[in-house]
From Swiss-Prot:
<feature type="glycosylation site" description="N-linked (GlcNAc...) asparagine">
    <location>
        <position position="201"/>
    </location>
</feature>
<feature type="compositionally biased region" description="Basic and acidic residues">
    <location>
        <begin position="425"/>
        <end position="437"/>
    </location>
</feature>
<dbReference type="GO" id="GO:0071005">
    <property type="term" value="C:U2-type precatalytic spliceosome"/>
</dbReference>
<keyword id="KW-0539">Nucleus</keyword>
<dbReference type="GO" id="GO:0005654">
    <property type="term" value="C:nucleoplasm"/>
</dbReference>
<keyword id="KW-0007">Acetylation</keyword>
<feature type="compositionally biased region" description="Acidic residues">
    <location>
        <begin position="404"/>
        <end position="418"/>
    </location>
</feature>
<feature type="domain" description="PPIase cyclophilin-type">
    <location>
        <begin position="11"/>
        <end position="166"/>
    </location>
</feature>
<feature type="compositionally biased region" description="Basic and acidic residues">
    <location>
        <begin position="359"/>
        <end position="371"/>
    </location>
</feature>
<feature type="modified residue" description="Phosphoserine">
    <location>
        <position position="346"/>
    </location>
</feature>
<comment type="subunit">
    <text>Part of the activated spliceosome B/catalytic step 1 spliceosome, one of the forms of the spliceosome which has a well-formed active site but still cannot catalyze the branching reaction and is composed at least of 52 proteins, the U2, U5 and U6 snRNAs and the pre-mRNA. Recruited during early steps of activated spliceosome B maturation, it is probably one of the first proteins released from this complex as he matures to the spliceosome C complex. Component of the minor spliceosome, which splices U12-type introns.</text>
</comment>
<keyword id="KW-0682">Retinitis pigmentosa</keyword>
<feature type="region of interest" description="Disordered">
    <location>
        <begin position="206"/>
        <end position="386"/>
    </location>
</feature>
<feature type="compositionally biased region" description="Basic and acidic residues">
    <location>
        <begin position="457"/>
        <end position="472"/>
    </location>
</feature>
<dbReference type="InterPro" id="IPR002130">
    <property type="entry name" value="Cyclophilin-type_PPIase_dom"/>
</dbReference>
<feature type="compositionally biased region" description="Basic and acidic residues">
    <location>
        <begin position="269"/>
        <end position="286"/>
    </location>
</feature>
<keyword id="KW-0242">Dwarfism</keyword>
Amino acid sequence: MSNIYIQEPPTNGKVLLKTTAGDIDIELWSKEAPKACRNFIQLCLEAYYDNTIFHRVVPGFIVQGGDPTGTGSGGESIYGAPFKDEFHSRLRFNRRGLVAMANAGSHDNGSQFFFTLGRADELNNKHTIFGKVTGDTVYNMLRLSEVDIDDDERPHNPHKIKSCEVLFNPFDDIIPREIKRLKKEKPEEEVKKLKPKGTKNFSLLSFGEEAEEEEEEVNRVSQSMKGKSKSSHDLLKDDPHLSSVPVVESEKGDAPDLVDDGEDESAEHDEYIDGDEKNLMRERIAKKLKKDTSANVKSAGEGEVEKKSVSRSEELRKEARQLKRELLAAKQKKVENAAKQAEKRSEEEEAPPDGAVAEYRREKQKYEALRKQQSKKGTSREDQTLALLNQFKSKLTQAIAETPENDIPETEVEDDEGWMSHVLQFEDKSRKVKDASMQDSDTFEIYDPRNPVNKRRREESKKLMREKKERR
């Protein structure tokens, strides 16, 4: 166990949780997990965890809390959004008493946290470890798991955090926020689930059969009387002082269809109304109903007519807008054409200031006329291009054939066709390789060891060297 403590980095920060199971001291790794520690300390300073329950208990694994709603799906961080995970190579889920952030996925940390009750290697690199339980308070932490739980890992009587106290805050710049505490819709007694009722074992009693029969009869009577208000007639059927005849009999007869506000006052006079008067009243009511229905039908028809008229008016407005746009476009086009024509006229009417401008304008008109003669893109345009190419080829071959090779005229700047008959000639600057024995400025020095001259020279030099050695 000591090697585990040696591997873990030193802590920097301490918080005390006061729970219904006892006090729990938590030391924080604020350098290794700064975001998680800052979030936890600030929520403790803001009393965010006060009166929150430990809503999830997995025996031998974890105890989870920190959700103000108590459902396991609530809680927010101080950053206003889930913050990222912070993993460290020296912090592993290898023992009990570690405090880590609970999340629903990667980088989804909020306010919920959990204590480990044992080794949990499957949680490594999935949850951020930011603290550990120290001292004897680890036994109070273990008491949090000693509760009855249901199939959803929710305790029947969960422990809760009464208050939090920050003993050492490594973050001096934390400013607690003012959080409005939500009012609980139900009192705490109603939120807590009741313990399951025990079943009665009548076989242990000497009068068990009689007690069981009485219990069944009571249950049957309570089920039959459940949800119904009973009078003394229902409960005391054998009482001779109670009459079984109702006090007031309901009068059978046709009641009028419409009743006015003064119904109670006119009830006494209804008995004296003759049959003819009743028939007249019914006819009046029927006529009135017919008028109402016809008025409703008429109003519905008028509404449909109004809708049709509105839709027709909208269509007319759209058509008017479209026509207006077309007129504006035509007008703008007309103005542009008029401006172009005026510009052309002004160019024609203006006298050329000098010969160069006049020549430029003539050339421009010439090429514009040629451009107008050109056909549009397509097969005809391609045919025209091929015809021009063939014409140029024939012209080039004709110019070469007419000009003899010896009599090549010099090209002139103004002659556009002189270059067609010109022949390109280059100066021969190649150097000749001659014999190595001949000394010439234009020859290259070539050394070939197989050359007989070079062989003789080598033999003579060897002979001279031998003679020198002998003389010594």
